[in-house]
């Protein structure tokens, strides 16, 4: 699935603490491999690289929903490498968590804030990225502020190549 609106919309959500900076920057697409696309932009603190994918399947009884995305970000100036983030396309239920399943044994729990879900810390991100490299599909289950359960399925085809690409681009 091509990510045509992600360069700008993705940045607004991914870097919500840096919204003004993100709006001022236009991300540059640097590579694409199967389901994943890599981007970079110059932030106030230096170069930022991220990779993104949209779900190949969405399930849930919702009437209106924005576009969900899975993202992995490197911010070398902040010593952040492989930060995993999911954008739901809706506001999560307050205090809820998101379950990410990769393969038969890889289940991860992420905390939510607004329309985004994050790992609790960098070691958790590293474990999740490692599982994403090994897997071929990833399922993300969340609950909206209205109580609607959603299940998004992502292809992990091209994930490893794009992770290597953003790691080379943002060391």
PLM features: residue spans?
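C-terminal segment of classical bacterial N-terminal signal peptides
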Residues: 13-21
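Bacterial N-terminal signal peptides that target proteins for export
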Residues: 1-8
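Intrinsic disorder/low-complexity segments enriched in polar/small residues
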Residues: 3, 21-22
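A generic "folded-domain core" signal
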Residues: 22-171
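Intrinsic disorder/low-complexity segments
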Residues: 8-11, 23
């Amino acid at each position: 699935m091509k990510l045509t609106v992600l360069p700008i919309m993705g940045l607004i959500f991914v870097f919500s603490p840096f919204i003004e900076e993100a709006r001022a920057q236009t991300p540059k697409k640097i590579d694409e491999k199967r389901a994943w696309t890599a981007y970079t932009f110059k932030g106030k603190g230096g170069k930022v690289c991220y990779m993104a994918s949209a779900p190949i399947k969405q399930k849930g009884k919702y009437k209106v929903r924005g576009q969900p995305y899975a993202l992995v970000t490197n911010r070398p100036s902040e010593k952040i490498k492989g930060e995993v983030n999911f954008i739901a396309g809706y506001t999560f239920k307050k205090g809820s968590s998101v379950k990410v399943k990769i393969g038969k044994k890889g289940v991860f729990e992420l905390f939510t804030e607004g329309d985004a879900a994050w790992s609790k810390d960098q070691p958790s991100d590293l474990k999740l990225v490692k599982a994403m490299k090994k897997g071929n599909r990833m399922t993300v289950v969340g609950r909206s502020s209205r109580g609607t359960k959603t299940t998004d399925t992502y292809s992990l085809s091209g994930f490893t190549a794009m992770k290597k690409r953003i790691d080379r681009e943002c060391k």
